[in-house]
Amino acid sequence: IKFLKKINNSYFYSEGNRENLFFVIEIAKILKIKKKNLLKTLKKFKGLEYRQQIIFKSKNLTIINDSKSTSFSSSASILKLMSNVFWIVGGLAKKGDKFLLKKKNCKHLKAYIYGKNKNTFINELKNIVQYESFTNLKILIKKVFLDIKKNENLKHKTILFSPAAASFDSFKNFEERGKYF
């Protein structure tokens, strides 16, 4: 546990990335990699683009590009860890996908919904989170920043671009969607 605290890399905050970290640590033990070398590498590890990628961080605002997220479960894993989240969600919903976080876990969460299947997202989220819907991502992003400005008193705000959907309604792929964001 002491070793984990020394890593201090926000990339490993999410459940999935933490599981990968534990796997890497176990492999490093088997391969007899020196702890100081492993620590040095893990501290500066950035991960892959568009996968819970922190693209901006200041004292009170973090912006995360998780364009790779194509299901509610992939978005929920990171949503569970945060408060004061401005969540950008939408695109082509996966059939039968369900949002499993409870209302009590979503008190400090607002969803900004867009995309071809926005009504599917609205129906899934309407009784759980506060939300607004938009015709396109460009208008939505402007509104997120207006809301951020209106809520200046909130500490540690996060803009989370984690669409929980496929990108093909507006983009060629999740990479193009991530670049656009």
How should each PLM-predicted stretch be described?
Residues 176-181:
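Short, basic/aromatic-enriched C-terminal tail that caps enzymatic domains
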Residues 31, 130-133, 170:
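A structural signal for short, well-ordered beta-strand elements
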Residues 10-108:
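Nucleotide phosphate-binding/pyrophosphate-handling subdomain across enzymes
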